A protein has these predicted regions:
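Hydrophobic alpha-helical connector segments
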Residues: 79-110, 159, 163-166
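N-terminal intrinsically disordered/low-complexity leader segments
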Residues: 1-15, 82, 210-214
Length: 214
């Protein structure tokens, strides 16, 4: 087979994978994340279940692909927001990134449940699928280290403990928002509006001691 023929087959296969993942998202939006089934996805696409197995051998494989795609989208949203920011101030960049994060989560609740909640019994993302999430954590660690280097934070802020606290207070508020007011806008959200206050608390907790050189 010519390279052009192989390219067409590869492209068509990727298009079918995207169609499957899109159908899975639509079904989970309507019926719940944990209720996904391969037969329902096949019906949605007008396929026979055996044909679907050529692309995904199990529904856990679909969850895995969606976890990876969601983690990639989530990271892109944060990076693009910071890249477009007209400031170098660490705390302002924090607000911008957290705003982008929370908006993305509210606009993509299915991905958010896969990434941040244990909604699917028995599902664990593969190392490949989890890699973009680890890259996002490394982005955050570097950001917090920049805050340390600029004298805004103590060194402990950029440790595993600091990362755990930061992600807990930010993702925790977004989780509360999605659980209690899933249809609210970002501007009207009772919990996400507390994100700037939560970040202030983080910076106050890890603030350098007065009079101490950093």
């Amino acid at each position: 087979m010519s390279s052009a023929g192989l390219d067409r087959r590869t492209r068509r296969r990727q298009e079918t994978i995207e169609e499957i993942l899109t159908a899975a998202i639509e079904l989970m939006e309507a019926e719940g994340v944990a209720s996904l089934s391969l037969s329902a996805v096949a019906r949605q696409l007008g396929m026979q279940p055996p044909s679907l197995y050529q692309y995904f051998p199990s529904k856990m494989a679909i969850y895995d692909a969606l976890f990876q795609r969601g983690a990639e989208f989530f990271r892109e949203a944060r990076l693009e927001a910071n890249a477009a920011a007209d400031t170098d101030d660490i705390r302002e960049l924090d607000i911008i990134a957290v705003t982008a994060f929370s908006r993305w989560c509210m606009e993509n609740p299915v991905y958010s449940q896969l990434l941040f909640w244990r909604t699917v019994p028995g599902f664990e993302p593969s190392p490949e699928a989890f890699a973009p999430a680890q890259e996002t954590l490394e982005d955050l660690r570097q950001h917090l280290q920049a805050g340390v280097d600029q004298g805004h934070l103590r060194p402990e802020a950029a440790t595993e403990e600091g990362l755990a606290l930061y992600t807990s207070i930010t993702s925790g508020l977004v989780s509360q928002q999605l659980a209690n007011e899933p249809h609210a806008s970002f501007e009207d959200g009772r919990f996400v509006r507390l994100l700037p206050t939560a970040l202030d608390m983080f910076y106050q907790y890890y603030a350098p001691s007065r009079g101490k050189k950093t």
